[in-house]
Amino acid sequence: MIMTESREVIDLDPPAETSQEQEDLFIVKVEEEDCTWMQEYNPPTFETFYQRFRHFQYHEASGPREALSQLRVLCCEWLRPELHTKEQILELLVLEQFLTILPEEFQPWVREHHPESGEEAVAVIENIQRELEERRQQIVACPDVLPRKMATPGAVQESCSPHPLTVDTQPEQAPQKPRLLEENALPVLQVPSLPLKDSQELTASLLSTGSQKLVKIEEVADVAVSFILEEWGHLDQSQKSLYRDDRKENYGSITSMGYESRDNMELIVKQISDDSESHWVAPEHTERSVPQDPDFAEVSDLKGMVQRWQVNPTVGKSRQNPSQKRDLDAITDISPKQSTHGERGHRCSDCGKFFLQASNFIQHRRIHTGEKPFKCGECGKSYNQRVHLTQHQRVHTGEKPYKCQVCGKAFRVSSHLVQHHSVHSGERPYGCNECGKNFGRHSHLIEHLKRHFREKSQRCSDKRSKNTKLSVKKKISEYSEADMELSGKTQRNVSQVQDFGEGCEFQGKLDRKQGIPMKEILGQPSSKRMNYSEVPYVHKKSSTGERPHKCNECGKSFIQSAHLIQHQRIHTGEKPFRCEECGKSYNQRVHLTQHQRVHTGEKPYTCPLCGKAFRVRSHLVQHQSVHSGERPFKCNECGKGFGRRSHLAGHLRLHSREKSHQCRECGEIFFQYVSLIEHQVLHMGQKNEKNGICEEAYSWNLTVIEDKKIELQEQPYQCDICGKAFGYSSDLIQHYRTHTAEKPYQCDICRENVGQCSHTKQHQKIYSSTKSHQCHECGRGFTLKSHLNQHQRIHTGEKPFQCKECGMNFSWSCSLFKHLRSHERTDPINTLSVEGSLL
């Protein structure tokens, strides 16, 4: 835009003055035409309509009615009621008021981003505060704060103000004598710098107000650093001299590039060399125009690196992070000429990866160098990125900031919360291109793909033909077309495909310099794209079936070292994962997670057909076989199918042992006792028909058998000796001890053995003098509550045990059993009924 400036010129020649006025009028006319042309191609923005509405003045209209109508038009242009809903209009009004009440130092930064909602404005402010906090934590030392290599020609620091101030100096005026900064200066708020523009002018403005003893430096080629005079006093004379030499060298580099005039340069060098305590000065007016040099494009890339340097004003002695100095040294050695196709950025010399921002390039370089500058103060673990250290520190603090809105479960990392959401939604975005199976987690897909590779390796021949390589190259090109971002990477890696020896193996894991990522060959998830920087790589051993990690105890081998570590806990008995609620420990984290659902009551796996919920996914899979009728586990001996593996295991025991239950009538032998009972009922029914006995007892026995069958279906754990079934395996184990007479639990007082742990506690109460359970009727005390309940039947007259034959009632079960034996001697059918009832 052409700017006109008024000048006071004393001239006695009228024609010259007239021509000057005509020239000014011509310039203004051209400016108006340029504005009209720009408005056609650059329509007013939301901020423009807002400013028109807020800055409208009454005198701009001819009268009150026109002023009101004009305001209505401007308000409609701002709020756009024909496009926005009432909620959106209210949001705009709230946003306008929110921007008004913001502190003055935040308002220009937020308005520069043009937020369209209150949430966007809040996000901008939070980002500013977060960067401020990070920069305060990254303290740098005073003398070494600006390393020599940092003074690159393009590294120019932006101004602290969102709108840089430019002070034009008249060429005919002599340079003014610079003034020293006042000793009493307020610290200037360090806010994140706005992106540099091509036409932005560099300034070295010095701010000084207030009462605190602080001196502010605006570095031209480096960063803005604030020093307290007390901090400067901690430095010795050699350190002060070193800093002045660095300053001279930096300004010399800038002058050589044309960023500073020679007069101003000599003046600044003289000021830096001054031995007084006020070491830093700057001219009040300095003209700095940015030359159109190609190296100046490097400034925006160095912005992320420059922002990492900051001095903490609350600390007396400054510190320097050595890794930051090495990072800056590495940055200055990188030239923008290394980029391909004229792009600005940095390319890694080890793996060829390209980065636009210098900060991302620095983080990537630590992968090759193995540097881990961020160390945990609690356990000493080190990390190559600060975000990883922050996530690790939450393990010590117990902080879990990411909470699920559905079940309330909290997580330390946001990615874990995203994975957890798929449990509620049932979404499985990661699909296998080979078999079409979907998975909820990327790691599960990787493990599944390894199985395909092992299967293919067994089917492939030993030939190393070119057709195999060409087919893989073709598949890589197909996926490179699906994702243009990977095209360059795929072309680089196609030439690095290794020999496909036994099993079509491929170099899946990048050896820091070469290799093909697995996902470039097998594809990506079905419903969303994955970040290729986070894709793990399949090692060559997964396709060949090699298991290099071997257990020294039992000789078992594993593909991954993590699986070996988990396996070794079985031998060592180590259980590092402990439940905070009940104190139980587990050797794997997944087992602890499943156990914690017992306390929380969480059942994330729901059956879509009947709505029944389960704590473990495998239980849901077993339950779904009830609806489908599928019985995948079949017996090789008799061909019988089962819905659960445990049922098949119990069935196989029947084939492995002898038939021990024999019928006395016909001599037939049975595996299970309940089968013998069913068979004997048939014999009793035949006898009843011959003798003409009432069929009521016979039908009652059949009912008992049918009830027993239903019971067995719901209770999968069955005793091989007596046929009794249980719903839980632990109950079956305790029941086996009644047959084997095993008593593994011993009393510490009398050394008596008992079969169950609960019986041990009950037994030990005999030796305790306290009888906590007392009868209210007679005052008698008992050690066990069950004994008290039996005693109270004497007072109440309760007789809960009834004989089904004669209807006689008894107070105790032992009395009922004695009574039933009298019926056994008279009626053989009742013998079977008693046995059936006991079962």
From Swiss-Prot:
SMART domains: KRAB, SCAN, ZnF_C2H2. There is a cross-link at residues 216, 248, 270, 303, 317, 509, 513, 709, 785 (Glycyl lysine isopeptide (Lys-Gly) (interchain with G-Cter in SUMO2)). Residues 218-291 form the KRAB domain. One of its GO terms (cellular component) is nucleus. One of its GO terms (biological process) is regulation of transcription by RNA polymerase II. It is found in: Nucleus. It comes from the Eukaryota. GO terms for molecular function: DNA-binding transcription factor activity; DNA-binding transcription factor activity, RNA polymerase II-specific; RNA polymerase II cis-regulatory region sequence-specific DNA binding; zinc ion binding. The keyword Repressor does not apply. The modification Phosphoserine is found at residue 335. The keyword Magnesium does not apply. It holds the Pfam family KRAB. CDD domains: KRAB_A-box (cd07765), SCAN (cd07936). Belongs to the krueppel C2H2-type zinc-finger protein family. PANTHER family: ZINC FINGER PROTEIN (PTHR24393), ZINC FINGER PROTEIN-RELATED (PTHR24393:SF100). May be involved in transcriptional regulation. This is Zinc finger protein with KRAB and SCAN domains 5. The gene is ZKSCAN5.
